[in-house]
Amino acid sequence: MGNGMNKILPGLYIGNFKDARDAEQLSKNKVTHILSVHDSARPMLEGVKYLCIPAADSPSQNLTRHFKESIKFIHECRLRGESCLVHCLAGVSRSVTLVIAYIMTVTDFGWEDALHTVRAGRSCANPNVGFQRQLQEFEKHEVHQYRQWLKEEYGESPLQDAEEAKNILAAPGILKFWAFLRRL
C-alpha cells in the first residue's frame, strides 16, 4: 500500500494513510498541512497543521458539508506558499472528492474537468458514486457561490490554478486517454 503522494497543483498533493505518516516524503514535498478524511482521522505528527474530518467511504456519506472548511484550509495553506497533503485511507475517493471541490472553486471547471485534472496526477482517483453525485449537485447549485465567497474572503488569487489546470488538461492525449478508459 502506498504508491507515494502525487502532486495535483503546486502546493497540493493527494495521498493515502501511509503517505501521511511518511516524514521523509512529507519533508521532500514541503508539506506543512494535512487534511485527513477517513473514519478515524486525527493528528499524527508534530509540527504539522491538521484538519481532520471523520468520514466513511460510503455513497451515503455527506462530504458536501465539509467542502467549505476543506477549501479554506487548502487555500490558506497554498496562499502562504506552503504545501497541503489531502489523504484518506487509499487516496482514491474521499480525498479526491475534496480536492475536486477545491479545483472547481479556484477555477471555472466543472466536476468532470476537475476530476480529469486530478487523474492526470493521480490515475487511481475515483470518487464513489455518491460522492460523484454530490460533486454534480455542487456544480449545479453551489460552486458559483463558493467562487464568490473565495474572492470576497481572499481577493484575487496570486495562484495560477486556472492556467495550471488548463495546461494539465491540454497535455497531449490526456482527454483522449480518459475517454478511452471510460469506454472500457
Swiss-Prot record:
Subcellular location, record wording: Cytoplasm
Binding residues for a protein: 89-90, 92-94
GO cellular component terms attached to this protein's record: cytoplasm; cytosol; filamentous actin; leading edge of lamellipodium; plasma membrane
Lipidation (N-myristoyl glycine): 2
Residues with PTM Phosphoserine: 58
Gene Ontology process terms (BP): cellular response to epidermal growth factor stimulus; immune system process; intracellular signal transduction; negative regulation of cell migration; negative regulation of focal adhesion assembly; negative regulation of T cell activation; negative regulation of T cell mediated immunity; negative regulation of T cell receptor signaling pathway
Modification after translation, per record: Myristoylation regulates subcellular location, and is necessary for activation of JNK.
PROSITE patterns (UniProt xref): TYR_PHOSPHATASE_2, TYR_PHOSPHATASE_DUAL
One term of GO molecular function: non-membrane spanning protein tyrosine phosphatase activity
Active site: 88 (phosphocysteine intermediate)
Protein name, per record: Dual specificity protein phosphatase 22
Gene this protein is translated from: DUSP22
